[in-house]
UniProtKB/Swiss-Prot annotation:
Species name: Mus musculus
GO terms under cellular component: bicellular tight junction; cytoplasm; endosome; plasma membrane; trans-Golgi network
Biased composition annotated in UniProt, kind: Polar residues: 369-383, 538-549
Gene: Tjap1
Protein name, UniProt field: Tight junction-associated protein 1
UniProt feature, compositional bias: Basic and acidic residues: 14-23, 485-498
Keywords assigned: Cell junction, Cell membrane, Coiled coil, Golgi apparatus, Membrane, Phosphoprotein, Tight junction
Membrane topology: Peripheral membrane protein
Residue ranges of coiled coil: 42-171
Bias (Pro residues): 311-320
Compartments reported by the entry: Golgi apparatus, trans-Golgi network; Cell junction, Tight junction; Cell membrane
GO annotation (BP), single: Golgi organization
Tissue distribution of the protein: Widely expressed including in adult thymus, heart, lung, liver, small intestine, kidney, spleen, testis and skeletal muscle and in embryonic brain but not detected in adult brain (at protein level).
Short name of one Pfam family: Pilt
PTM-bearing positions, type Phosphoserine: 295, 315, 340, 483, 537
């Protein structure tokens, strides 16, 4: 009994499922068991064994259930493990493929990077080339703009120069026409200073006058180079027999074309082709063109030059007639018409129109007052004799001629219409003044002693050409006109002499024949030798390039 007491306090408390359910026997029961018998004790132990067996069976059942659950869980875990292994294999395959694709993409990226680097270098070069091309294009645009501006400036300059050239050409043509009609009052010309053709013309006129006066030629009629030719003689030689009209119906024989626009020289070889050639010419004197042993073409008389047209045929300039440098006009008889059709023309054109109107009016008035003479009708071999106009048709013809003159100048210089062929082939100088000049320059007039300064129409030879007298003393010895008034008085006869219709008039003891109606009295302004300057000055101006500057 004493051994059962220490069992109440075990060393370690077991878990609740393993604990034994010991019923505490009360003290009263223990006291009762002590008093029980063995039989009763056996029954009590058997009951306890059965209870233990029941408990063992329930524990076994529980253990089996746990084993079954463990087996079921193990199978599930094995299935899950297989599935996870399969998934792992799949993931490994995917990883392998991804690694291969990554390697391939890496190689591709490297190649693309190389290509991009190459393209970048090319793009840099292209960008540089594009920038350079743009700069070149901008430079070319600037150059094009500058060249365009220069071209426009050059075109404007060319247009202005063409206009100036056209105006200068027309002015020069008009100046040539006016200079051949205007007279110089400022100097007397020596024979050696005149052009060759003008020397021949002066000789032929003087020779023809001497032949009319005395048929036998005198040996003293030869001219020396130092002989002073009065301006009146040159004016008579160069005087035009017809008015300066571009629309006139009269036209001469077809002659040679004009030498140049700037200056038109005159044909001086209209005399006798069979005349003997002049001997060796001295210093400054020109020889005749035709010779005895020349060709038949050279021996034929050259026709007179055509009248200057507004648009002459250009040809190489004549060596004896270079261009002029300065052209001046006198304004004594210059007037501008009220109803002028040329308000925008040049000064020279207006002068020519006004001068032509003035001289045309004086010409018609003189023709109506002076009857016709047979000498004037036979003077010009190039023009047919026209019948004398009646006094009734004078006013109508004057008005129509003035209108025709203005219309002709408008057609020539405003509309720029080319002149007709008849006007182009018109001769510049007729020969109807030969009989009058023959009477004026007869040997009696040329050798008679001059009683007054008005008698300078004959050619006066100096006594000593090689003497050392100055030019002024020589001109005083030759009794030449000193002032333009004296020369004008010598050229224009007095009114008393012109009013007499029959017979010559006497002025200062000299007989002046009445001019013919076909060649009326001209103003000194219409007779000019402005273009007859010294050859040295003309040559110097031509060499220096200052001609018509």
């Amino acid at each position: 009994m004493s051994s059962a007491a220490p069992a109440k306090k075990p060393y370690r408390k077991a878990p609740p499922e393993h604990r034994e359910l010991r019923l505490e026997i009360p003290v009263s029961r223990l006291e009762q068991e002590e008093s029980l018998t063995d039989a009763e004790r056996m029954k009590l132990l058997q009951q306890e064994n059965e209870e233990l067996r029941k408990r063992l069976a329930s524990a076994t059942r529980r253990t089996e259930a746990l084993e079954r659950e463990l087996e079921i869980g193990q199978d599930c875990l094995e299935l899950e493990l297989g599935q996870s292994r399969e998934e792992l294999d799949k993931f490994k395959d995917k990883f392998r493929r991804l690694q291969n694709s990554y390697t391939a993409s890496q190689r591709t990226n490297q190649e693309l990077e190389d290509k991009l680097h190459a393209l970048a270098s090319l793009s840099h070069s292209w960008i540089f080339a594009i920038k350079k091309a743009e700069m070149d294009r901008k430079t070319l645009d600037w150059e094009i703009v500058e060249l365009t501006n220069k071209l426009l400036d050059a075109r404007n300059t060319i247009n202005k120069l063409e206009e100036l050239n056209e105006r200068y050409r027309l002015d020069c043509n008009l100046a040539v026409q006016l200079l051949k009609c205007n007279k110089s009052h400022f100097r007397n010309h020596k024979l050696a200073d005149l052009p060759c053709e003008l020397q021949d013309m002066v000789r032929k006129h003087l020779r023809s006058g001497q032949e009319v006066a005395s048929p036998s030629p005198s040996p003293s009629s030869s001219l020396s180079p130092g002989a002073v030719v009065p301006t009146s003689v040159i004016a008579r030689v160069l005087e035009k027999p017809e008015s300066l009209l571009l629309n006139s119906a009269q036209s001469g024989s077809a002659g040679r074309p004009l030498a140049e626009d700037v200056f038109v020289h005159v044909d001086m070889s209209g005399g006798d082709p069979a005349s003997p050639p002049a001997p060796g010419s001295p210093n400054g004197e020109c020889c005749s063109v035709s010779t005895a042993g020349g060709s038949p073409e050279e021996e034929l008389p050259l026709p007179a030059f055509d009248k200057l047209s507004p648009y002459p045929t250009p040809s190489p300039p004549h060596p004896l007639y270079p261009g002029r440098k300065v052209i001046e006009f006198s304004e004594d008889k210059i007037r501008i018409p009220r109803n002028s059709p040329l308000p925008n023309c040049t000064y020279a054109t207006r002068q020519a129109i006004s001068l032509s109107l003035v001289e045309d009016g004086s010409e018609r008035a003189h023709r109506s007052s002076v009857p016709s003479s047979p000498a004037s009708a036979q003077g010009s071999p190039h023009h047919q004799p026209s019948p004398a106009p009646s006094a009734l048709s004078a006013p109508a013809s004057s008005a129509s001629s003035e209108e025709d003159l203005l219309a002709s100048w408008q057609r020539a210089f405003v509309d720029r219409t080319p002149p007709p062929a008849a006007v182009v082939q018109r001769t510049a100088f007729g020969r109807d003044s030969l009989p009058e000049l023959q009477l004026h320059f007869s040997p009696g007039h040329s050798t008679a002693p001059p009683p007054s300064p008005h008698r300078e129409r004959g050619l006066v030879l100096p006594a000593e050409p090689d003497s050392g007298f100055p030019q002024d003393e020589e001109e005083e010895m030759l009794n030449l006109p000193v002032s333009p008034e004296e020369e004008r008085q010598s050229l224009l006869p007095d009114k008393e002499g012109t009013e007499e219709a029959s017979g010559p008039s006497h002025v200062d003891g000299r007989a002046w024949p009445l001019p013919s109606p076909s060649r009326p009295q001209r103003s000194p302004k219409r007779m000019g030798v402005h273009h007859l300057h010294r050859k040295d000055s003309l040559t110097q101006a031509q060499e220096q390039g200052t001609v018509l500057s």
